[in-house]
Amino acid sequence: MSALLSGIIIEVGSFAFIRLLGGILILPTYATFAQPLLAVAAVGTMFIGNLSALQQDDLKRLLAYSSIAQVGYILLGIATLTPAGFSASVFHIWNHALLKGTLFLLAGVVTFQIGTRSLKEMTGLGRKSPILAVLFTLSALAMTGVPPFGMFWSEFLIVLSSLTVGSPILTAAVVLMLVNLLISIAYYFRIIRTIAFGQPSDALNANSGGRVPKLLIIPCVILISLSLITGLYPNMFYQPAVNAVKGILTGFSR
């Protein structure tokens, strides 16, 4: 359920925002007022999400706050009030859904295996289950925006579309987005360090549930593979986002 809520339902609101208001907000009459407000809201959402995630020991709660920050990135693309920015945001929705869905599924697997959501109690999990450590590491790295995963391209396109507008407010928002990316790197690397390295904690030794069922791992492998394919062939997935936005804005212009 957590994977569904974070990977799909949260993003539906962002897409609905573009669908319902995008064509109206790009009108010059509204853009003058809407753009600064959206940019400030985007940056505020990023900081609230990332700074809250940075303080969490509960893995699922950390991922949930991280999702709030991702909505901020999506909102920054919307704040450009351009087709390129809208398309970048829709593309980011796809990439976030894949990766955050993977991480929530993995968090569920760990909870199923050892009965805890505490990162401290997951120390050394990789020594008990290398496959979980590998999947957590790949997913967390991908969420930080490193290539060759798809998140790199959608974040790059959000930055590019924001800078192309030439607005000082959006330029400042991009700088603050980069600061937020550094914050997210800090807590995602904490996940990697905790799970993939170190000696197994006492709680882990006491509660380890043995081998991880393949049926729990296969969906995670599929999702992270889709993220990798998106990064290697970005236009295959970006173009549908462009077409969707074009269809929305064309509908408003009629």
What is each of the regions a protein language model found here?
Residues 1-156, 160-187:
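Hydrophobic transmembrane alpha-helices and their helix-loop junctions in integral membrane proteins
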Residues 129-131, 181, 189-254:
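Cytoplasmic/organellar membrane-interface segments at the starts of transmembrane helices
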